[in-house]
């Protein structure tokens, strides 16, 4: 009888390997689409070294195994070794490769080696792997090709409706109500199709920016649609807390007040401080009255679980290994799992260095910096007495995540979900924001000259104009203070552009003329989010400084801090509108910051 069963499956697909990798190397999705059962973590059993103990139940038999970390090199190969502690299999190894062909296709080779542990294994392996898995794998590969061509990668692999007749009627009714308030007919149709035909894995965590990119659509418009869909009971929103290392979910809450300032990642066994600018993102899921989405884990360690990691390999204790690698230019980190330090790696087209040589010692060494060309040899040495998991990962944060910092500066969110605030006493870092304060010069005399009712009408009109222009420039009105507003933006340029447009529009409307003129000040820097009077507000030195800048405006002028003025995007924008503005640099002390003088820049809108 055979001691090892070996299988080699081969496919040829139309897409380039980088594109097909996103589905094929998503082993959680692939296992789901090929009818494998959900898995569970066996918390009571400790794995050896780097491995984890997992289990599933198939045909009434509980199978338990010890799984080593997946190994991969994006987008060319991945594999895993499983050593079984119960069930009909003793050991199984999977190894997959993707190779580009001269005619633009991708050759896929999927190899499996399985060792039976008993008589049942000799019977089950040929049936399950040699026949059933081969059939299911081929079906999934064919469907993936179709989905990529049709740009429907989130749709159920067999394009089956997931809704009952009652659920369809309920969805249509709510979608019709949504359309009355959010005039995005084609987007709503696509969203309905996604909710009806999307698979559970895709719908368990809807990222609006990810969907926008897949549909070739505007990110902010998709976010707006999802927010309105939540308001009308089509979707529910959640706040996901992400681990800074593996970037996986560590917690989910439905309201900002339920966020804790500290969190723990079980997978990485690390504690971390939660912040708004990276570690909290808004996601959506269908409202359960329309569709119940239930997703278990089908695989917990495949390449697409941590897609920012382009390389992951186990290096045996005392071993030295070489790898030929090819990655796109950018910033990366080279780390050993469990280590506190990371080596910085910059891949640069202009570099003539084609070798990266790193030694991991028993004690963490200081972080080093390396520069290599896109094609390089990686020589890695593990001089410790334990196996090491060596990782190369992109340092750039998740591009498809709509972070809490960004969402909190989105006007639609503040209009629809003003009740979403932090718990009192809880503060979250939001990274750097552009903070804007305005005031109206001449408002006091206006009230005296034309009367309270007429003057108040002017002020309200000016608020509406500012709010709309701020929103159009990706900012949000945080609060009004008398005749003034406070607004926040992710980018200084957007804040400046909104004020230039506001001065012009107010002037055209007749508000920013005569004795009533707009004053504004903008500063950019670190801030924290707080609950102030049941409003999601910002606090810190950046806010305090920004609040004091508009006093230097003489009307129709925007005061910029030096940080804002020297921002690259701001500099380019000022060159674009140089015929519309006049710039003057001034030096002055600022109240509350008396120990130093500041360079400020008056931007007069002509």
Regions found by a protein language model. Name each.
Residues 1-46:
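Hydrophobic ligand-binding cavity/cleft-lining segments
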Residues 292-398:
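N-terminal accessory interaction module
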Residues 374-375, 379-431:
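Regulatory cytosolic signal-relay segments
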Residues 230-298:
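Cys/His-rich short segments
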Residues 81-135:
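Beta-strand/loop substructures that line and gate deep hydrophobic ligand-binding cavities in soluble
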Residues 555-556, 562-606:
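Intrinsically disordered, glycine/charged-rich C-terminal tails and inter-domain linkers
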């Amino acid at each position: 009888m055979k001691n090892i069963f070996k299988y080699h499956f081969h496919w040829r697909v139309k897409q380039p390997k980088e594109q097909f990798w996103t589905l094929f190397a998503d082993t959680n999705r692939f296992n789901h689409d090929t009818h494998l059962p959900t898995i569970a973590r066996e918390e009571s059993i400790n794995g050896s070294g780097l491995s984890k103990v997992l289990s599933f139940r198939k045909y009434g038999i509980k199978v338990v195994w010890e799984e080593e970390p997946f190994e991969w090199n994006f987008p060319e190969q991945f594999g895993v070794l499983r050593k079984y502690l119960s069930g009909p299999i003793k050991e199984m190894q999977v190894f997959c490769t993707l190779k580009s062909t001269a005619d633009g296709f991708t050759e896929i080779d999927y190899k499996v080696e399985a060792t039976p542990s008993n008589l049942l294994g000799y019977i089950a392996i040929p049936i399950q792997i040699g026949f059933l898995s081969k059939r299911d794998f081929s079906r999934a590969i064919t469907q993936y090709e179709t989905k990529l061509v049709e740009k429907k990668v989130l749709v159920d692999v067999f394009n089956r409706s997931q809704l009952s007749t009652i659920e369809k009627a309920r969805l249509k009714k709510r979608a019709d109500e949504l359309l009355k308030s959010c005039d995005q007919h084609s987007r709503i149709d696509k969203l309905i199709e996604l909710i009806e035909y999307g698979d559970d894995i895709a719908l368990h965590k809807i990222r609006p920016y990810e969907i926008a990119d897949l549909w070739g659509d505007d990110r902010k418009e998709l976010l707006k649609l999802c927010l309105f869909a939540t308001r009308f009971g089509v979707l529910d929103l959640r706040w996901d807390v992400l681990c800074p290392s593996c970037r996986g979910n560590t917690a989910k809450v439905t309201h900002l007040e339920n966020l804790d300032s500290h969190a723990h990642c079980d997978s990485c066994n690390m504690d971390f401080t939660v912040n708004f600018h990276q570690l909290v993102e808004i996601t959506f899921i269908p409202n359960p009255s329309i569709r119940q989405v239930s997703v278990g884990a089908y695989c917990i360690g495949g390449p697409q679980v941590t897609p920012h990691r382009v390389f992951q390999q186990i290096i045996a204790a005392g071993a030295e290994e070489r790898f030929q690698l090819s990655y796109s230019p950018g910033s990366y980190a080279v780390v050993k799992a469990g280590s506190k330090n990371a080596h910085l790696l910059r891949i640069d087209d202009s570099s003539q260095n084609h070798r990266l040589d790193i030694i991991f010692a028993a004690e963490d060494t200081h972080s080093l910096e390396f520069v290599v060309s896109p094609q390089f040899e990686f020589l890695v040495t593990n001089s410790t007495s334990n196996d090491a998991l060596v990782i190369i990962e992109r340092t750039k944060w998740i591009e498809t995540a709509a972070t809490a910092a960004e969402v909190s500066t989105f006007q639609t969110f503040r209009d629809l979900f003003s009740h979403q605030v932090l718990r009192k006493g809880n503060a979250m870092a939001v990274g750097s924001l552009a903070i804007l304060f305005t005031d109206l010069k001449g408002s006091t005399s206006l009230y005296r000259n034309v009367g309270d009712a007429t003057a108040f009408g002017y002020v309200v009109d000016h608020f509406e104009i500012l709010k709309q222009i701020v929103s159009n420039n990706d900012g949000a009105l945080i609060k009004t203070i008398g005749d003034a507003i406070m607004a926040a933006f992710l980018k200084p340029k957007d804040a400046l552009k909104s004020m230039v447009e506001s001065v012009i529009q107010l002037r055209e409307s007749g508000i920013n003329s005569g004795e009533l003129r707009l004053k504004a000040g903008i500063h950019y820097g670190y801030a924290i989010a707080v609950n102030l009077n049941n409003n999601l507000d910002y606090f810190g030195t950046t806010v305090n400084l920004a609040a004091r800048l508009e006093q230097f405006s003489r009307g129709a002028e925007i005061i910029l801090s030096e940080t804002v003025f020297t921002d690259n995007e701001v500099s380019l924008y000022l060159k674009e509108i140089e015929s519309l503005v006049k710039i003057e640099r001034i030096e002055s002390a600022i109240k509350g910051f008396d120990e130093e003088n500041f360079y400020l820049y008056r931007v007069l809108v002509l």
